[in-house]
Amino acid sequence: MKHFEANFDGLVGPTHNYAGLSFGNVASYSNAAQTANPKAAAKQGLQKAKALADLGMTQGVLAPQERPDLYTLRRIGFSGSDAEVIQKAAKQAPALLNACCSASSMWTANAATVSPSADTRDGKVHFTPANLVDKLHRSIEPITTANILKATFKDPHFFQHHAHLPEHAHFGDEGAANHTRLCGEYGHSGVELFVYGQEATNPNAPKPKKYPARQTLEASQAIARLHQLEDESTVFMQQNPDVIDQGVFHNDVISVGNQNVLFYHEQAFLNTDAKFDEIRRKMNADMHFVKVATSQVSIDDAVKSYLFNTQIITLPSGEMTIIAPTDCQENLAVFAYLNELVTLGTPIKQVRYYDVKQSMQNGGGPACLRLRVALNDQELAAVNQDTLMNDALFGRLNTWVEKHYRDSLSVKDLADPQLIVESRTALDELTQILKLGSVYQFQK
């Protein structure tokens, strides 16, 4: 039986905009109020996904959320027709309207945490949608996320879906952006590394001072229990609070792993040596810890370029490749480091660069755009085949984007009631292309 890692990229939604909603995310804040190009953003994401499929990788797509989210706006007291709800919110509470129009679900690294069947006691692939309670605009995602995941990974013989964790700061969960699975081979049991920002129930434990720690130890432990993971296949490691305060809002901004490689900045973690020893002890394979020193790449350069928000993939040839944003080429220190990295004798042998600038300007690089799902060939056969990237789907989705998406969207445009009609028309057609059924509230 073959085993491999599939990547499921989030399709960029029609309301992609720069409202600067994510405190602690430097790129999101610094580009607030710029005019976005939803059509270009969606096409950039599709091109990156298709490029990985063309490399021989198993690549899928996940549908975006319904936005504007009129159901949340009605729940908080705005009434009338759909157009009146939008107009009232724009006048009385524009910040709330902005939150209900966010296309942030494109960053599917935050959609859920996934544990493969090789790690779980019941031998199923487990999914838990992230509750994303730290950010209003993302906290309204989990129910629809669950619908989309269930429509993509449908067969209960292979896939186990859990409800998101309780919606409280104690269980703040940001999904796979704070989770890396380390292993020798994808089909062998591995070590699931859960990285957290603070302990919610321990006021004396280290935590950041300036920006919020979005992931708690308690949430990570709950996910491990739900996913039926053994103690010997889990490691819980704290992210350095100082780097959170420098804009490292998720662990995938400061480290990334694949199989037996963990690529990380030397300032990424607390108690690094002891925790790496624990990983080595629990692994059934040799580990390569690839450290980037501050003298080579500063935290500031790492955050601006998203050096660590890259993907490390294993090609069908067995060779590892980094999928990086073109921003890494444009940063002299980062580009020099990556050119050196491929000569150092690690399993990482090449770097490929892709333009995802529309996403980058909102604070999300290549790793943010994908949810990793390790599968075997039987499990892959049970996945909704209409969500898997190939030439035909790439063509259909590009045509769909060209038909439905605007090429310019400013924050003030979010008050246009026509955006509701455009978005729902697009998503209704998308559910037919991907054969998802009725995953959105407006379809029910």
Curated annotation (Swiss-Prot):
Mind listing the GO molecular function terms for this protein?
N-succinylarginine dihydrolase activity
The residues that hold substrate are 19-28, 110, 137-138, 214, 252, 362
Q: What pathway, per the record?
A: Amino-acid degradation; L-arginine degradation via AST pathway; L-glutamate and succinate from L-arginine: step 2/5
Q: Which residues form the active site?
A: 174, 250, 368 (nucleophile)
Q: Quote the InterPro entries the UniProt record gives.
A: AstB_sf, SuccinylArg_d-Hdrlase_AstB
For this protein, what reaction is catalysed? N(2)-succinyl-L-arginine + 2 H2O + 2 H(+) = N(2)-succinyl-L-ornithine + 2 NH4(+) + CO2
Top enzyme class = hydrolase
Keyword list, A-Z: Arginine metabolism, Hydrolase
User: Which SUPFAM superfamilies does its entry note?
Assistant: Pentein
Which EC number(s) are documented for this chain?
3.5.3.23
GO BP terms in the entry: arginine catabolic process to glutamate; arginine catabolic process to succinate
Q: Give the Pfam families listed for this entry.
A: AstB
Q: Please give the function described in this protein's UniProt entry.
A: Catalyzes the hydrolysis of N(2)-succinylarginine into N(2)-succinylornithine, ammonia and CO(2).
How is the subunit organization of this protein annotated in UniProt?
Homodimer.
**Family as reported in the entry's similarity comment:** Belongs to the succinylarginine dihydrolase family.
This protein is called what?
A: N-succinylarginine dihydrolase
Q: Which gene encodes it?
A: astB
